[in-house]
UniProtKB/Swiss-Prot annotation:
Record-given protein name: Nitrate transporter
Family: Belongs to the major facilitator superfamily. Nitrate/nitrite porter (TC 2.A.1.8) family.
Native organism: Bacillus subtilis (strain 168)
One Pfam family here: MFS_1
Keywords recorded for this protein, A-Z: Cell membrane, Membrane, Nitrate assimilation, Transmembrane, Transmembrane helix, Transport
Length: 401
């Protein structure tokens, strides 16, 4: 497989637009997490409330992913993406000119979930342009849009320090409008777009064991990635007494590892199979989170989180190398379901960390809990991988799995 095949086997401009749409949407989706230290200071939030505020957009994004996944299969990804970006402008405007109460903040967080649902649109849009042997790479490139978190964590605190967090939400409208114009102008739906089917025809995917295995795996990889991305600023400030800006810088470094290594996870999975890659990555993540639970020095915890986030990011790419091998026709719907599971995992992780900190007075218990969850995922991959390689259709060779 050569990278040049991406140019000849698909539509590079659509792949680029899918990445940009997901990138700017992801930046907006985690905005409350990037600004969480400022928001918690304004509202005087408890550790539990801090976790809840940054987790609300992640949970609502899970619900919206299913909705946008269905729309992607029925009206096409381009129209769905346009609708999603228009709706995303509402909470940004609300946060700029409102957001003066905790109730408003929760409502804004719910609407920001539409930005997180972009995942269920961008990945199928890219996937449908490319053949099976390029799925991991194409999906990994589009999925690398989760690097939008970098912009939120790097620039959000700096801008909030100068102008306040409300203005930062208004500033986020600028890149969204730019991407909106580029997307409308250049993105195209694949001619391989399946014809719309009755809604009931999609229900059978809920009865497939593979759907729920993918959900479990992605709730750990993506849930871990986005959950930590949203919560680490608070962790660094609370545990290591860093300034808000320095905390954001370290979060950016860790997020970069997960974001830019996602395509690598997809690329390696194309060559050796997604289950083999995941089995290694879950062990790495478990070891890193166990190390973080000891609350070592700042330099050591950054190394552990960097490697752990890299493993989670590669795991995201590996999971979505597997999805098209099993669900080619229903990829929009399945992407929405699996993406929703990832969002649910991302909702629970900040709440686990915040709640256990409030209950025990330490973050150690929360991180060791996440380490145990990663080990459970490792066991699931080992159990499922052999069965998948034997039972999936001839369209996917054992090496693809």
């Amino acid at each position: 497989m050569k990278l040049s095949e991406l140019k000849t086997s698909g539509h590079p401009l659509t792949l680029l637009c899918s990445f940009l749409y997901f990138d700017v949407s992801f930046m907006i989706w985690v905005m409350l997490g990037a600004l969480g230290v400022y928001i918690s200071q304004d509202f005087g939030l408890s550790p539990f409330e801090k976790g809840l505020v940054v987790a609300v957009p992640i949970l609502s994004g899970s619900v919206f992913r299913i909705i946008l996944g269905i729309l992607t299969d029925r009206i096409g990804p381009k129209k769905t993406a346009v609708i999603g970006m228009l709706v995303t402008m509402i909470p940004l405007l609300w946060g700029t000119f409102g957001g003066r109460s905790l109730t408003e903040l929760y409502a804004i967080g719910i609407l920001l979930g539409v930005a997180g649902a972009s995942f269920a649109v961008a990945l199928p849009m890219a996937s449908r342009w490319y053949p099976p042997h390029l799925q991991g790479l194409a999906m990994g490139i589009a999925g690398a849009g989760n690097s939008g978190t970098l912009f939120a964590t790097l620039f959000g605190p700096r801008l909030a320090e100068q102008f306040g967090w409300h203005i930062v939400m208004g500033i986020a409208l600028i890149p969204l409008l730019i991407v909106f114009i580029l997307f409308v102008s250049m993105a195209k739906d694949s001619p391989a777009q399946p014809s719309p089917q009755p809604l009931k025809s999609y229900l059978h995917v809920f009865g497939q064991k593979e759907t729920w295995f993918f959900c479990l795996l992605y709730s750990v990889t993506f849930g871990g990635f986005v959950g930590l991305s949203s919560f680490l600023s608070i962790f660094f400030v609370d545990q290591y007494q860093l300034s808000k800006i320095h905390a954001g810088d370290f979060v950016t470094l860790c997020v970069a590892a997960g974001s830019f290594f996602r395509p690598v996870g997809g690329l390696i999975s194309d060559r050796v199979g997604g289950t083999k890659v995941l089995s290694v990555l879950f062990v790495i993540v478990a070891l890193c989170m166990a190390g973080v639970s000891s609350l070592p020095s700042l330099s050591m915890v950054i190394v552990l989180l960097f490697v752990g986030m890299m493993g989670l990011g590669m795991g995201n790419g590996a999971v979505f190398q597997l999805v098209p091998q099993r669900f080619r026709k229903e990829i929009g719907m399945v992407t929405g379901i699996v993406g929703a599971a990832g969002g649910i995992g991302g909702f629970f992780l900040p709440n686990i960390l915040g709640s256990l900190k409030q209950m025990t007075g330490t973050y150690a218990i929360g991180f060791i809990t996440f380490s145990c969850i990663a080990l459970l995922a490792f066991a699931l991959v080992l159990a499922a991988g052999y069965y998948w390689r034997k039972s999936w259709s001839a369209e996917s060779s054992p090496a693809d799995v």
